[in-house]
Regions:
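Conserved, structured core segments of small domains
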Residues: 20-140
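Bacterial Sec-dependent N-terminal signal peptides
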Residues: 1-22
């Protein structure tokens, strides 16, 4: 019984070791230059925008959304915002997401609070740390 168990463990260990191979396309120097760790990954700030408590008339809402779009452009131009987009209507009232190329939740909160739609409570924002490929910031 011990021999059978040992043989099975040895066999599965061999398969596991064979499955662990380096990615020949992985560029460690590029990953490091983008702030990536040994795995080519880094922390980002993920923002989920939700419907807020403020429900203004259409003219005010349109003005706030215009400011929201201008803020998105400003953050993208600065390289701090790498993904932004709306979500399809859903039961959780999620309206959109941001992925920010910044290090801390505190900086994320400051940047999100610079958005007039968030400041006015037309949108609320939840912030999370998100671990993703350092190459995401190449898309900007």
């Amino acid at each position: 019984m011990k021999r059978t168990l040992f043989a099975a463990v040895l066999m599965f260990s061999s398969f596991y070791a064979l499955g662990q191979s380096d990615n020949p396309k992985f560029d460690q120097a590029l990953a490091k230059s983008l702030g990536g760790d040994d795995y080519g990954m880094k922390m980002y700030i993920l923002v989920i925008l939700k419907t807020g408590s403020f429900s203004p008339e259409k003219r005010i809402s349109d003005s706030l959304f215009m400011g929201h779009m201008q803020n998105i452009k400003r953050l993208a131009d600065s390289g701090k915002l790498i993904v932004a987009g709306p979500m399809k209507k859903n039961e959780r009232n999620y309206r959109g997401i941001f992925i920010m190329n910044i290090a801390t939740l505190e900086e994320g909160r400051v940047l999100v609070d610079s958005d007039p739609a968030v400041r006015s409570k037309l949108l609320d924002a939840e912030l999370f740390q998100w671990y993703g490929s350092a190459a995401h910031c190449l898309s900007t």
